[in-house]
From Swiss-Prot:
Localization terms from the record: Nucleus; Nucleus, Nucleolus
UniProt-recorded name of the protein: DNA-directed RNA polymerases I, II, and III subunit RPABC3
Gene Ontology biological process: transcription by RNA polymerase II
Subunit structure: Component of the RNA polymerase I (Pol I), RNA polymerase II (Pol II) and RNA polymerase III (Pol III) complexes consisting of at least 13, 12 and 17 subunits, respectively. Pol I complex consists of a ten-subunit catalytic core composed of POLR1A/RPA1, POLR1B/RPA2, POLR1C/RPAC1, POLR1D/RPAC2, POLR1H/RPA12, POLR2E/RPABC1, POLR2F/RPABC2, POLR2H/RPABC3, POLR2K/RPABC4 and POLR2L/RPABC5; a mobile stalk subunit POLR1F/RPA43 protruding from the core and additional subunits homologous to general transcription factors POLR1E/RPA49 and POLR1G/RPA34.
UniProt function note: DNA-dependent RNA polymerase catalyzes the transcription of DNA into RNA using the four ribonucleoside triphosphates as substrates. Common component of RNA polymerases I, II and III which synthesize ribosomal RNA precursors, mRNA precursors and many functional non-coding RNAs, and small RNAs, such as 5S rRNA and tRNAs, respectively.
Start and end residues of each stretch annotated as Non-specific ssDNA binding: 16-40
Main location: nucleus
Domain of life: Eukaryota
GO CC, any one term: RNA polymerase I complex
Family: Belongs to the eukaryotic RPB8 RNA polymerase subunit family.
Length: 150
């Protein structure tokens, strides 16, 4: 689908392992089912409570429009086009601020880590470089989440 940079199902393996730092935010440590990616994600648990063992679908996209049309980064309440956000429970908009690899001087990176800030809520998605090829520093991305019943 146009505009989707990454999509997978994640299992919540740990919550706030270093201790709770903020009242309304928890840091989730998750692992994906298909691509074995590691995810660390800050979530506003007052809006979207998450429990240990929960499974959720995560999509990282460059646009909310199904046809891949880029938006201008501003909310337009009169826009009535269908949106990817309609199918999800929790959506954030942020900026990729760092990409790190395990490259050496002789080999290209096989594992990458993409870091995104969603207004101060942070995400690190780490895994095979092939799964993170669409991420670019300073690009704007949407994170979309929906819990799965299992």
């Amino acid at each position: 689908m146009a505009g989707i940079l990454f999509e997978d199902i994640f299992d919540v393996k740990d919550i706030d392992p270093e201790g709770k730092k903020f009242d309304r935010v928890s840091r989730l440590h998750c692992e994906s089912e298909s691509f074995k990616m590691d995810l660390i994600l800050d979530v506003n648990i007052q809006i979207y409570p998450v429990d240990l063992g929960d499974k959720f679908r995560l999509v990282i996209a460059s646009t909310l429009y199904e046809d891949g049309t880029l938006d201008d980064g501003e909310y337009n309440p009169t826009d009535d086009r269908p949106s990817r956000a309609d199918q999800f429970e929790y959506v954030m908009y942020g900026k990729v601020y760092r990409i790190e690899g395990d490259e050496t001087s002789t080999e290209a990176a096989t594992r990458l880590s993409a870091y995104v800030s969603y207004g101060g809520l942070l995400m690190r998605l780490q895994g095979d470089a092939n799964n993170l090829h669409g991420f670019e520093v300073d690009s704007r991305v949407y994170l979309l989440m929906k819990k799965l019943a299992f």
